[in-house]
Structures are given as C-alpha cells and as structure tokens.
Amino acid sequence: MKTHHTIIIAGAGGIAEAVALILAEWSTVTPTIFIGNRTLSNAQKLVKWVEEGTSRDCTIKAFHLLEEGSTEEMKQVFEQGDILLDCLPGTQAPKMAGFAKEYHMHYANLTEYVAETEQIKALAQDASTGFVLQTGLAPGYIDVLAHHLFQAFCKEFQVNKVDTLEFKVGALSKNAVAPHFYGFTWSPVGVATEYIKEAEVIRNFKKTNRPSLSERETIIIDGITYEADLTSGGAADLPDALAGKVETMDYKTLRFPGHYAWVEAQIKKECDSDKPIKALQRMMETHIPHIEEDQIILYAAVQGKDATKTLQRREVAKQILPQQVGKYQLRAIQTTTAVPLIQAAQLLLETDLKGVVLQSELDTNSFLTGNFIVPVYGEV
C-alpha cells in the first residue's frame, strides 16, 4: 500500500496467513491489520506468526469474528476498517459482504461459488464502496490474464472476434503417485466442489453450462504432459463479458495424467449420494495425502484468424514455485492466491471505484503489472 490503511482480514487459514504477511512485508506504507476468526486462538496464533515473520514494524491485532450475529468488539473493529479482505469459505461471503456494506468498507473476496457471488452482486449494487469479487488465482488472476490476451490479440490483428480462448490452472504437487496421481495443496472441499458443480463456458458465441469433468484433453506445457478438464468457478464473469466475441471459451483445471479417471471412478461409487460434494470430499481425503511442497502451473491461449484469414495463436505459460516472504517460505498456492486479492485491495483503496467490480472490469494492464502481482507471477 502506498498510504496508510486499516485492513481487516476475515479468516486465519493459509491464505489469510499469506495475505497478512505480504501486506506487512511488501507494502510501501505498512497498514494496520486486524485478523478476525471464529476461533479466536487461531487469529491470535496468526498475529504472533506474522509478528515473528516480518522484518517490518507492523500493527496487527486479533479479534473474535462470530459465525452468527455480532459483538461490540466486532463493531469497533469494523468502524475502523477501510477494507475487508474475505479469506473465509465461500458460504460466508454474503455475510462478510454485508458487514462491509453496513460499515462502509471496501470488500474483496476469493470465492468461486457462483450462487454466493450473485447474492453479493445484488447486495452491493448501491454500495458507496467498491466490491471486487472472485479475485484470487482461479477465479482471479487467470481470468485477467485471459482477458488481456483477448484484448491484445484483437488489437494486434485488428479483429473483434476470436475462435477460442482457453485458460487453465493446476495447483499441483511436484510428484504424483498411483492410483490418484494427486496431493492436496489446498482445500479438499474446494477441489470436490469444482469437480461436481457445473462449469460456465462459451459455445457458439453463447454462454452455457457444461458438466464438470466432461471434456478432458491432453496438453503439453513446457514439455510436460498434463490432463485438463472442465471444472466450476474458474471462469469468473468472462462467459458473460465475452459472449458474442469468442466462439469457444472455457476454464479447465490441470492435473497429472490418470487423476481424472480415478476421480470419475470415485464419483461412480457414490452416484446415489444425496450430497455428492461431501461424498467425493470424504472419498478423496481417505486416499489422497496433503503435500507441503507445491507448484502452480498456468496456461492461457487465444486463437483466431487475422485480417488475411491466417490462423494465429498467442499463449502464456507459467510455473510458480514456493517463495520466501519475510522469514518464511510460503507455498505457491498461498502467494498466487493472496497477491491478486491484495492488488485488488490496493485498487479499491487508491481509486474511487464503487459498487461491484468483476474480473472482466479490471484494467488488465495495470493489474498484471501491479506491484504485488509481479513479484509472484512475473511479467506477462
């Protein structure tokens, strides 16, 4: 941050941890930070962890953030806040956005949950502050990158429509073993959710839905073979924003070969379950270990014909590894999710944006060259 702000972080998990540490360590002017969590001791542990891990002087405090209702302490914290950064599970997003609106704070979140996002869009229509939604890795950075590629392609080749826009992200372990070829590097419920809920795509220039895990493909990125398949949430609002401009567009999740076949077998075993997300989560957690050393693989490409009808393609691929921040090494999933949220926060705090701001509405060039984005993602 370039000037002093008071920033409230809701949550005390791995992403909240990264957001707090990066804010303390990388801000030009260190903000005042409040950490709120339903388990106060977890918020207090995070405060101590940041204080011990940053090389900068930082004012950071914990408070008890209730799941239901509010307290006088919460009210006092919210009245001081300039922005609320929501790192809680997506089901809590409408409630957190409600607090932001009530106390005239800006708000930014990470969730890929579509229904909750629609609730917030309705709530924030007439807000006096700005609400940037779905601003993590996927949805988030990958959508801004894809939109940037689309805009650059249209400008370079003097066209206003393209054939395909594809963007893919994998939060992966460095190694993978049979039979599942996977290791959890982030929330198991998030993985299960994106495998079960439908994906929003563009087909024949129109927004539509497709079942997740229904269009598997093989792709080679930097010489390594992956599988990619449709999953929910990662496309953000691009299916709405680019309908009529892109013939075929989708977001897919990258995995090592063999993983999706294993997942499909588990889903078939639980086909009678009335709670398929919980059933798949339980099945995966029984067999798949959590992995500490991770990597993020991302790929985006746009393809279409130029003015002479020659087929052209532009693409970006990146591998992002764990990174030292202050005295700690953060996992790749932490940094890649945290910095788009922080970059969006800086945008809200240092401009006059109001109401809902979706991923397609962000200025792609300034976002992708942002002072928090570049140290993690590099230049485009």
Regions found by a protein language model. Give the residues of each.
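Conserved N-terminal Rossmann-fold NAD(P)-binding element of oxidoreductases
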Residues: I7-G13
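N-terminal Rossmann-fold NAD(P) dinucleotide-binding loop
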Residues: A16-E17
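Helix N-cap at the beta1-alpha1 junction of Rossmann-like dinucleotide-binding domains, i.e.
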Residues: R38-N42, V114
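Rossmann-fold cofactor-recognition segment
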Residues: G53-G69
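Conserved Rossmann-fold cofactor-binding substructure of NAD(P)-dependent oxidoreductases
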Residues: L66-E79
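ADP-ribose/adenylate-binding Rossmann-like module
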Residues: C87-P89, F99-T117
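Rossmann-fold NAD(P)-binding glycine/threonine-rich loop
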Residues: L110-F131
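C-terminal catalytic/substrate-binding lobe primarily of soluble NAD(P)-dependent oxidoreductases
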Residues: A152-V380
